[in-house]
Amino acid sequence: MKNMMNPEAKWDKKALTYPRYTSSEDTYEAKIIRTLEGADVSFKGKRVLDVGCGSGKFTLRIAKEAASVLGTDISSQMLRILHEDAEKEGADNLRSLKCTFDDFDPKGEKFDIVFASVTPAVRTEEHFRRVTELAGERVVYIGWAGRKESEMLYAIYERCGITPKIFNDVPVLKEWLAKQNIPYKTIPVEETWVRTYDRAKAEALCMEAIEDNASGACIKTVAPLLDTMAGADGRITDRMHVKMEMIIW
């Protein structure tokens, strides 16, 4: 049976296990910001809109340089985490708004840069048009380019006979930009994210990943399979192989 959880509830649930901001410079987010600087994109002194900001992994890093940042998201739990971490970091130039991007009303507020990273909030031609209109200077879009493979989850999918979803939204955006005669710059991003989870968190991530397709028999295979992956300390290390593209226009 398909899971009928609405998007807000879905992302509130994801917030329980979702990665959150860290100030380390040895992170994917820090690397992306450095790559953008090398591509002549600076957030320094800019008014930034972060669409689908989630827990604020990018939002807080951008706020270190920007004049102001407004993050939008549909999940109250994601925004709660964002503000917890913003308070710790002393990020008083950051605000948030709980809404879908379709319902977002800037109320006359102007933005220099619109930022959107692997978010379902920006997926359609209307969304592409809108971020373009909202950005006074630049749009920075990070999207999937055909690969998002978790070794842990793919082992579960194989055992359960589940066909993994293909994440590949970048071609749709490129086609739209070409139709609008909008020049853009593209930067490929290939990463392997290594994350270690305690047993409860690993099991929660697996159950979340299969909840739309899992039979009772499949659910029963999760715990034994995780047993085979656990280290001596009971923790499970996962490697996520991803391929994305940054599109800047």
Q: Residues of each region from the PLM?
A:
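A short, conserved alpha-helix within the catalytic core of class I
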Residues: 121-134
